[in-house]
Amino acid sequence: MASIFSKLLTGRNASLLFATMGTSVLTTGYLLNQQKVCAEVREQPRLFPPSADYPDLRKHNNCMAECLTPAIYAKLRNKVTPNGYTLDQCIQTGVDNPGHPFIKTVGMVAGDEESYEVFADLFDPVIKLRHNGYDPRVMKHTTDLDASKITQGQFDEHYVLSSRVRTGRSIRGLSLPPACTRAERREVENVAITALEGLKGDLAGRYYKLSEMTEQDQQRLIDDHFLFDKPVSPLLTCAGMARDWPDARGIWHNYDKTFLIWINEEDHTRVISMEKGGNMKRVFERFCRGLKEVERLIQERGWEFMWNERLGYILTCPSNLGTGLRAGVHVRIPKLSKDPRFSKILENLRLQKRGTGGVDTAAVADVYDISNIDRIGRSEVELVQIVIDGVNYLVDCEKKLERGQDIKVPPPLPQFGKK
C-alpha cells in the first residue's frame, strides 16, 4: 500500500506541488519515484445512468467497439485513475473514428500507467484481440536486448534500401500524452534531454525543439523520415495528444542521424536506430546499445521507464505494448508485390506491409515498408530475427520470380515463442 505522501506525488498533484518547490526537485525525480505508482481506484458520480451515456458503436470497426459491452461500460464508466483519467477519455478516439478501411485499429488509448489496471476489464480483451491471442491476465512478456544473438542480419542491398528499428518508452510517474498537463509534458522533455546529454561516442548528438524550427526545416526532416509528421492523425487529435502543439516537442539525434529520439509525440519518447542499406544487424546493435544507455542515464537521475511483466513496456496505444518494437526495411519487390500469394506469404511470416511513406501511402517504384506484426509475447531479439528471416525469404522469392521460377507460401510461424 502506498503512503499518503506517495499518493500525493502522483500525476497532476505532483506537478502542482513540484511547481511550487522549484525545478531542482523535478530534475532529480527523486521523490516521485521512491515507490511504484499505486492504481488507487476512485469513483466519480455522474448525473445520468451508464445506459444514457453508452456510445453508439453499431457502425464501428475497431477493437474497442468489438470488446466494449453495456455491462463493461456500466462497471467502468464512473471509475477514475489517480490522475483523473476516465473510461470515456480512453475510448473517445475510437468513438470518433469508427475504423480504418484496411487496418483494424485499436480504438482506445491510456492516459496514464494506471489506466491499464483501472480499466483492465476493457483493456485486457482489447489487448488480446489486437495481439492475436496474447492474454495479459495469464501470460508474461519477456525482454531481450542482446544483439549478438542475431544471425544473417545483412540483406542484399540490390533489394533492401534502408533498415530501421524503433520502440517507445514512457517515464513512470508522469501522465501519458493524452492526459498530461503542460508541466508534465515539459518535464518529460527536461528529463529526456538532460539524460541524452550524457550520450558519448557515436551516440553523441544534440536536441532540436520543434518550436524553434522553421517550417522548411520541419518539412525536410519529415520528408527524410527523421521527424514525426504534423499532428493531423485522428489518433493524436481525438485523443488529446495534439494539445499545445508544438510546446515541449522535439527531436534529438546523433551527428550521423542514425540514432534518434522523438519527444512528446504519441509517446513520451520514441527511440529509433536507422541507416541506408541492408545491415539490420548493425542497426539493431546500435538500437540495443543506445536504448540501454538512455535507460541508464535516466535511472541515474532518479527516474525509470514504465514496465510490468504482464504488459512489458507501457505505452499510450495498446498496439505498442510489450516491446513497442517495430523493425522494418524499405525493400523493392516489383514482381512479388504483384503476385496473388504476396499477402498470404506476409501473413505466414508474421510480417506486414505499408506503402513507401508508411500507413495510408502508396508504394513508390514498387518499394514497400515491411515490418513485424507482433509487439508482445516475443522478445526484441525474436522479433528482429523474424523480420530478418522473413525479408530474406521475400528477396529470395523476388529472385526466383525474376528467373521465371515458382515460389511457395511458407508454413505459418507460431505466434508466441518457440513451439
Curated annotation (Swiss-Prot):
The Phosphothreonine modification is found at 356
UniProt-annotated binding residues for ATP? 162-166, 225, 270, 326, 354-359, 369
> Can you cite an annotated GO cellular component?
mitochondrial inner membrane
Could you tell me the EC number(s) of this protein?
2.7.3.2
- Annotated Phosphagen kinase C-terminal domain ranges read 159-401
The reply on keyword Nucleotide-binding is yes
The answer to whether UniProt assigns keyword Lyase to this entry is no
Q: Mainly localized where? A: mitochondrion
Q: Where is the chain membrane-spanning? A: none
Q: How does it sit in the membrane?
A: Peripheral membrane protein
Q: Which Pfam families match?
A: ATP-gua_Ptrans, ATP-gua_PtransN
Concerning InterPro entries, the annotation shows: ATP-guanido_PTrfase, ATP-guanido_PTrfase_AS, ATP-guanido_PTrfase_cat, ATP-guanido_PTrfase_N, ATP-guanido_PTrfase_N_sf, Gln_synth/guanido_kin_cat_dom
- What GO biological process term is on the record, naming one? phosphocreatine biosynthetic process
Q: Where is this region: Cardiolipin-binding?
A: 40-64
Q: Write down the chemical reaction(s) this protein catalyses.
A: creatine + ATP = N-phosphocreatine + ADP + H(+)
Q: Supply the Gene3D superfamilies for this chain.
A: ATP:guanido phosphotransferase, N-terminal domain, Glutamine synthetase/guanido kinase, catalytic domain
Q: Where found? A: Mitochondrion inner membrane
Q: What class of enzyme is it?
A: transferase
* Presequence boundaries: 1-39
The chain residues annotated with the modification Phosphotyrosine are 255
Q: What does this protein do?
A: Reversibly catalyzes the transfer of phosphate between ATP and various phosphogens (e.g. creatine phosphate). Creatine kinase isoenzymes play a central role in energy transduction in tissues with large, fluctuating energy demands, such as skeletal muscle, heart, brain and spermatozoa.
Further information in the entry reads:
Mitochondrial creatine kinase binds cardiolipin.
Similarity section: Belongs to the ATP:guanido phosphotransferase family.
Please name the PANTHER family in this protein's record.
Answer: ARGININE OR CREATINE KINASE, CREATINE KINASE S-TYPE, MITOCHONDRIAL
What do we know about how this protein assembles, alone or with others? Answer: Exists as an octamer composed of four CKMT2 homodimers.
Q: What is this protein called?
A: Creatine kinase S-type, mitochondrial
Q: Corresponding gene?
A: CKMT2
